[in-house]
């Protein structure tokens, strides 16, 4: 009898873990699809934070292009921040994110808090025509949920 009880508890544990992972994967895909289908983006001067985008060919491996975006200097407190950075280059890998597969973060006004999303594109081709888009979701001091769709301007 103890053996069956042990097996049942083990199965319930496995089902619980896979359900959480499935929910995270579903949320990630929902954010990604929503961002990729977006036609209207927030203007840079309307953002309540600064962004710095960087893209550079990897020094150690010429077939890789490293890219990153830093989100910092918020003008307001930003709680439960979730962010996803995508691009339109063919890619099988997951895009960099925060707050979707891990715990959401907080950016506080007048602090050194920042978010950095890093990714890599495996290519030797020119990357000058790749478009990058950022989705950012957060709650402000009044409890209002904000969603930002931002197209990264390059050059």
Where in this protein do the model-derived segments appear?
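N-terminal export/targeting and maturation segments
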Residues: 18-95, 100-101, 111-112
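Hydrophobic residues positioned within well-ordered beta-strands of beta-sheet architectures
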Residues: 51, 65-67, 81, 117, ...
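Short beta-strand elements
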Residues: 143-155
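Short, cysteine-centered beta-strand-loop-beta hairpins and adjacent loop/turn segments enriched
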Residues: 74-77, 140-144
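C-terminal motif of bacterial Sec signal peptides marking the signal peptidase cleavage site
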Residues: 13-16
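Sec-dependent N-terminal signal peptides
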Residues: 6-9
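Short, solvent-exposed, Trp/other aromatic-anchored flexible loops in extracytoplasmic proteins
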Residues: 94-142
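Positively charged n-region of N-terminal signal peptides that target proteins for export
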Residues: 1-4
């Amino acid at each position: 009898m103890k053996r069956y009880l042990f097996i049942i508890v083990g199965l319930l544990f496995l089902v619980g873990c896979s359900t959480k992972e499935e929910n995270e994967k579903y949320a990630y895909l929902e954010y990604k699809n929503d961002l990729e289908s977006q036609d209207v983006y927030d203007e840079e001067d309307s953002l309540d934070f600064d962004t710095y985008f960087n893209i550079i060919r990897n020094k150690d491996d010429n077939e890789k292009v490293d890219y990153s975006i830093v989100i910092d200097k918020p003008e307001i407190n930003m709680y439960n921040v979730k962010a996803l950075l995508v691009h339109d280059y063919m890619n099988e890998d997951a895009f960099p994110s925060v707050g979707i597969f891990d715990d959401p973060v907080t950016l506080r006004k007048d602090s050194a808090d920042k978010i950095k999303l890093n990714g890599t594109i495996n290519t030797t081709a020119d990357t000058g025509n790749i478009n990058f888009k950022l989705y950012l979701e957060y709650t402000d001091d009044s409890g209002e949920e904000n969603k930002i769709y931002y197209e990264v301007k390059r050059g």
